[in-house]
């Protein structure tokens, strides 16, 4: 298993690089088989989904996030060589962070990075910034293309809760939406046209919740649900390399994610076994079917053929306008801090494409390791 702290994956490996206010960010993807049709447009459309400044609910930092592929592509297809992609930072304002050099911001990684590494790029959070997830999305875009090309796998994420406001749409409330192509296309249209990436009818109530927090110089969190469709039976391994364990590890690598649920999740603790168990039957063509999907597409750490259903808890953006108490590491005094800069009042909608990316990278890695996808050439 790869243990490098900036690399994720064993066979399909994604190494992310760069800092929030450095020259550039990006990713190197190693282990993608040759002959996969891939273009900068395939990556750009995913990056555009996480790009800042697209609504009043995201940071006003203006970045075009234009990707450039430097290697690994020839005549429109992958060669099997490492795919290096870079995005240059354009709208940096490092002076916004000069006041926090010695005063770690509550809720951020400032303190732990400073104590561990001593020489820490504190500008905008450096390596701990959400901007670094551009690398995740680059890797995820390539993984998505690979999964779609080989198995028609679709990965769809959306917001189901903002703060205390729970939406009326989710996989378990509306499973029929995921059963045909037309309803899926319509769902994606609704998600992508909404500033919170929420397909619920009560989404406006969520918007008001965020606006109220903004008025109070505060921020909010929420819950994102991710559904992976058409994943074949047999992906994953028992015991220590379970599919659910690998997916949870991948999703927990995303900044601001504080919890992961799979299938019925924590509600399973409230259910009877007779309610939780997904009963099986043969359809008319003798295919194995399940009456329910409380397992979330995974049994014993291995995919069972039903949709894989995951949810992540996203904490409120830690950068807020309110005065907060902290410490000065240089003077050893207790001080107050008022954070300047450009920040998201809610990070939830921009985490959606990042979460999809990490699910895709995990599935691609496990499917290459498991023999579902040839490691050298398609």
Swiss-Prot record:
GO biological process: amino acid biosynthetic process; aromatic amino acid family biosynthetic process; chorismate biosynthetic process
UniProt binding sites for NADP(+): 50
EC numbers on record: 4.2.3.5
Details of cofactor binding: Reduced FMN (FMNH(2)).
Listed GO CC annotations: cytosol
Sorted UniProt keywords: Amino-acid biosynthesis, Aromatic amino acid biosynthesis, FAD, Flavoprotein, FMN, Lyase, NADP
Known catalytic reactions: 5-O-(1-carboxyvinyl)-3-phosphoshikimate = chorismate + phosphate
Pathways per UniProt: Metabolic intermediate biosynthesis; chorismate biosynthesis; chorismate from D-erythrose 4-phosphate and phosphoenolpyruvate: step 7/7
Cofactor names: FMNH2
Secretion signal, residue range per the UniProt entry: none
Molecular-function GO term, any one: FMN binding
Positions that bind FMN: 127-129, 255-256, 300, 315-319, 342
Family, similarity comment: Belongs to the chorismate synthase family.
Role played: This reaction introduces a second double bond into the aromatic ring system.
PANTHER family in UniProt: CHORISMATE SYNTHASE (PTHR21085:SF0)
Protein name: Chorismate synthase
Organismal lineage: Archaea, Methanobacteriati, Methanobacteriota, Methanomada group, Methanococci
Gene that this polypeptide is encoded by: aroC
